[in-house]
Amino acid sequence: MQKLKQQVFEANMDLPHYGLVTFTWGNVSAIDRERGLVVIKPSGVAYETMKADDMVVVDMSGNVVEGEYRPSSDTATHLELYRRYPSLGGIVHTHSTHATAWAQAGLAIPALGTTHADYFFGDIPCTRGLSEEEVQGEYELNTGKVIIETLGDAEPLHTPGIVVYQHGPFAWGKDAHDAVHNAVVMEEVAKMAWIARSINPQLNHIDSFLMNKHFMRKHGPNAYYGQK
């Protein structure tokens, strides 16, 4: 697990590097599906002092199998998403400013241009709010459940992120670094959407044919963006 712990550590350290977290407001995890184990950031440990060996290994029930610290308080959310969506290899949660603003406003991040369409096929959805019973009960688990309720059976890698109402963004990818990449893009397109709608409040969504072109040339079966 040492290699995966190093990858998760590096991905977590990317969060302050890209300006996605303040203090300890974020976490990254990755899963080893063959072993059924997840590596995640320890709860409340400062990035300035954190080391790869500080990463915590848990099983799919959340039991700590390796590590001296308690795992992230959001571990149950990560595990619920891994259990539901086999294509996920890494998950990120942050409170990045612009994506969190959309979450607090209770609005999906609208697909307005090609930057968005290169990564997200359609709007980045916003979940419903959790009920008092859901919050007072298994809050983090129920956060995962409301994300799943919103995504349904859609392939999560086609829209690799969501904003949880009154909370903040979650992003995911094929591994930890890919998940962080998508979290960075989500924050940028959230900022772009806010600015664009401020300039033109009547702004419509990107044309569907243009969105399809940009997404499919990068992610479709005949994708031709980048190098082989």
Curated annotation (Swiss-Prot):
Broad EC category: isomerase
Matches recorded under InterPro entries: Aldolase_class_II_sugar_metab (IPR050197), Aldolase_II/adducin_N (IPR001303), Aldolase_II/adducin_N_sf (IPR036409), UlaF (IPR023499)
Any single GO BP term: L-ascorbic acid catabolic process
Cofactor(s) required, per the database record: Zn(2+)
Domain of life from the UniProt record: Bacteria
Database matches in CDD domains: Aldolase_II
One matching Pfam family: Aldolase_II
UniProt keywords, alphabetically: Carbohydrate metabolism, Isomerase, Metal-binding, Zinc
Reactions accelerated catalytically: L-ribulose 5-phosphate = D-xylulose 5-phosphate
GO CC term (a single one): cytosol
Expression triggers: Induced by L-ascorbate. Repressed by UlaR.
Cofactor details (free text): Binds 1 zinc ion per subunit.
A GO molecular-function annotation: aldehyde-lyase activity
SUPFAM superfamilies: AraD/HMP-PK domain-like (SSF53639)
Active site annotation, chain numbering: 118 (proton donor/acceptor), 225 (proton donor/acceptor)
Pathway terms, separated by semicolons: Cofactor degradation; L-ascorbate degradation; D-xylulose 5-phosphate from L-ascorbate: step 4/4
Family (UniProt): Belongs to the aldolase class II family. AraD/FucA subfamily.
Reported function: Catalyzes the isomerization of L-ribulose 5-phosphate to D-xylulose 5-phosphate. Is involved in the anaerobic L-ascorbate utilization.
Protein's name according to its UniProt entry: L-ribulose-5-phosphate 4-epimerase UlaF
Taxonomic placement: Bacteria, Pseudomonadati, Pseudomonadota, Gammaproteobacteria, Enterobacterales
Gene responsible for this protein: ulaF
